[in-house]
């Protein structure tokens, strides 16, 4: 069964939405040295632009299951893209670090909803015999975004200003939102009641991981002083409490029982270590290239490009 013209147009809108959100994640790292200089913040503070984004993004993913059970696909897609656009504009006009960070966190909330919703629409709307092709195009574009993001960002920073990056992303977001109002299929919410949002679990995961992340970050700059140690300890307690609570809820926010599978647990730990190393390299490499070697932002972007290209090539191969 061939895809209709409307389905192709909808696929383009969905893929572009995901592409912009993934591209946005890779644009910030080459801009970190410029942001640190302009806003007079140190490395441990500036890294919150990436780690904070990742944290909020991860927290929003389980919440999305609850939202999908209650709102239609078009409403969620438009809402998430609009939220992402608002955060992008806030970051673009931010003249101080708190405003910039706030914009990034709002961006992350929108992106955290958008990706699962996009996957759901692809699975619900496209026929079974064409679903593989749609997912393949989606995966290819998502792999392409990190490959060009740092280089594009470096070029823009050298030629203009890092604020322009967010204005460009904002413009692309608006271009995607307008046609999505007409092209994205408005599938009704499931209303199964399978997804339950436990307020305490949400609070524990947000505060636990947030405090732990802040504590580890502060330890790097302030050393083993009272505040970093206390926030780290409180964060660890919150995370442990969160996991214990998930084992006792009949319908948990996060199914932690899958970690009883030894292979899954080992794979998860390896994935965490790899992602941690990649995130650290993405933050430190532009600072190392630009601040210590005095090279341009474009060069720092080019340094990150080969790794991103190889990841894009190896991801589909690893799946086989």
Each model region followed by its residue ranges:
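Short, Lys/Arg-rich, polar N-terminal cytosolic tail immediately upstream
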Residues: 1-3
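Hydrophobic transmembrane-helix bundles of small-molecule transporters
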Residues: 158-269, 303
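Hydrophobic residues within the alpha-helical transmembrane core of Major Facilitator Superfamily
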Residues: 19, 55, 89-90, 105, ...
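Helix-loop-helix hairpins in multi-pass membrane proteins, especially solute transporters
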Residues: 54, 61, 65-200
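12-transmembrane solute porter fold
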Residues: 7-23, 28-32, 39-56, 63-65, ...
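Hydrophobic alpha-helical interface/terminus motif in multipass membrane transporters
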Residues: 32-35, 121-122, 156, 184, ...
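Histidine kinase transmitter module recognition
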Residues: 19, 38, 89-92, 128, ...
């Amino acid at each position: 069964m061939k895809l209709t013209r409307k389905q192709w147009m909808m696929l383009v809108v969905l893929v572009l939405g995901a592409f912009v959100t993934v591209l946005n994640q890779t644009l910030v790292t080459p801009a970190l040295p410029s942001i640190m200089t302009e806003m007079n913040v140190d490395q441990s503070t500036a890294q919150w632009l990436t780690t904070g984004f990742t944290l909020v993004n991860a927290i929003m993913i389980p919440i999305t299951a609850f939202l999908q059970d209650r709102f239609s696909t078009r409403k969620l897609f438009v809402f998430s893209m609009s939220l992402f656009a608002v955060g992008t504009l806030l970051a673009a006009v931010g003249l101080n670090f708190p405003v910039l960070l706030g914009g990034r966190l709002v961006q992350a909330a929108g992106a955290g909803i958008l990706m699962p919703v996009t996957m759901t629409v692809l699975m619900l709307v496209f026929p079974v015999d064409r679903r593989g092709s749609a997912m393949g195009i989606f995966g290819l574009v998502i792999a392409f975004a990190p490959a060009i993001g740092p280089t594009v960002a470096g070029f823009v920073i050298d030629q203009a200003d890092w604020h322009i990056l967010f204005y460009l992303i904002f413009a692309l977001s608006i271009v995607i939102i307008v046609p999505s109002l007409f092209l994205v299929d408005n599938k009704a919410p499931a209303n199964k009641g399978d997804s339950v949002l436990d307020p305490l679990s949400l609070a524990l995961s947000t505060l636990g991981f947030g405090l732990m992340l802040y504590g580890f970050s502060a330890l790097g700059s302030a050393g083993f002083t009272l505040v970093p140690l206390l926030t780290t300890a409180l964060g660890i307690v919150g995370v442990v409490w969160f996991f214990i609570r998930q084992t006792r809820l009949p319908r948990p926010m996060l199914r932690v029982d899958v970690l009883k599978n030894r292979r899954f647990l080992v794979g998860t730990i390896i994935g965490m270590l790899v992602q941690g190393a990649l995130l650290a390299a993405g933050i430190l490499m532009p600072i190392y290239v630009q601040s210590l070697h005095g090279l341009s932002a474009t060069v720092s972007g080019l340094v990150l490009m080969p790794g991103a290209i190889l990841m894009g090539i190896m991801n589909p191969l690893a799946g086989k």
